[in-house]
Amino acid sequence: MLRGASTTPLQDKRAFLPKRKLTELTGLIGNTPLLGVAFWGPLTQSRREQILACAEPEAFEKEVQGLVAELKTSHTGFRHAGMRNIPARHAISATTQCIAVNGGERWMFQDVHQGGPAYSAGIRPGDLLLDSGGREIRPPEDLTFAVGERVDLKIERLHGGQERARLQLPVPKSQKHPVTAPDPVHAEILSDQIGLLKVAMFPGVVGIDVAKDIDRGIASLNGCSRLIVDLRGNTGGGIGGLRLMSYLTPGKLEVGYSLTRKRRERGYRKEELTRFGRIPSRKATLFWLAARYAFVEKSILVVTEGLGNRRFHGHVVLLVNEHTASAGEMVAAFAEENNLATIVGTKTPGRLLSGNAFKVGHGYILGLPVAGYLTWQGRMLENNGIVPAVAEGLSRDALREGRDTQLEKAANVARHL
């Protein structure tokens, strides 16, 4: 404990984490592909007194979160295992966009995934958020939740009128990754032989279940000569995106690779990295898979599965937006680099690293990046993102008319491929 520090539970918690645990975690930061201990040590020291001065747990968490945010990378975070302050995209399966309304700013619901709490409560794209639990929320304040709670949101509907939407938030299976999974895959046939495959996320580390969902979605679009893959609002997940990428090309193609700091400094040839090129069909094989990769260096090369020719090959459009992140960006970058699809929408955020969550004591969890990700052509998407070949935003006025301008643009592009 720090000399002279109080022995109250909160003071003990504050002293324990900043001095002992956060200092120990400089070793974990050493695996970060972008920054190292030389950066983290002085920064921790400079913020220490601010952290120790916090009188309440919420302020303490906010200060440590601010410290971790100085890394300026994705897959960072600091929170309590009680799962407070979970962002809307993870808690209610919905994203928001800041728009101008009557001389001010409001959050507009943008991607509202089927099967998620927001969708089940009747919230739809274009609705405006007015308050949460009676407290007004405006940009730049983010909409966050505590999992398991019942929440009342005041909504201004797209077509006018105000209502209260009552959401019941489930308790996620994982405390380390508190994400409420919506229906991950939706498929439908649009006009002109265009199939639509919407993938909201890639749940699961290996992604056996979502891979099967993608299989069923593609099978239901049999006969379509053109395909739109809608990745808007896809916040990522595990390696299940490999199945989607494998449907975009007939053979086996290198996608990209994770790269730890240790491997980068030691030197490497990307062709010699350990390969991952098949999502198993049965969960019984997960034990074998875990044993195979448990003791290898965590720099892994991803290769498509070789699923054969599809009628829509060469006629694919990928829809992305500013919420398409992580594994969603991996899919988009692969399609772009190999000329497998035309990218339509808005620029992605550039949040693509391999991360892990570490328990640091007193119920707190620290999220840190542990490996970088590079495409096969050597691009790092972190903090860069993907710029669509065809730019198209989402219009609330068009939504009011029953039109999704981004989907309309994607369909028009698909017809001319």
Per-range role (PLM):
Residues 6, 148-150, 154-361, 399, ...:
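Cleft-lining beta-strand/loop regions that shape enzyme active-site pockets
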Residues 8-15, 30-35, 47-56, 114-117, ...:
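Second-shell loop/turn segments in exported
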Residues 19-29, 41-44, 48, 57, ...:
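Extracytoplasmic/secreted envelope proteins and their assembly/folding machinery
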Residues 25, 118-140, 228-230, 335, ...:
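Conserved PDZ fold ligand-binding element
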Residues 33-105, 150, 158-184, 417:
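Extended, small/polar residue-biased N-terminal targeting/export presequences
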Residues 85-139, 196, 210:
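PDZ/PDZ-like domain segments forming the peptide/carboxylate-binding groove
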Residues 356-394:
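C-terminal regions of proteins
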Residues 388-417:
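Low-complexity, Gly/Ser/Thr/Pro-rich intrinsically disordered linker/tail segments
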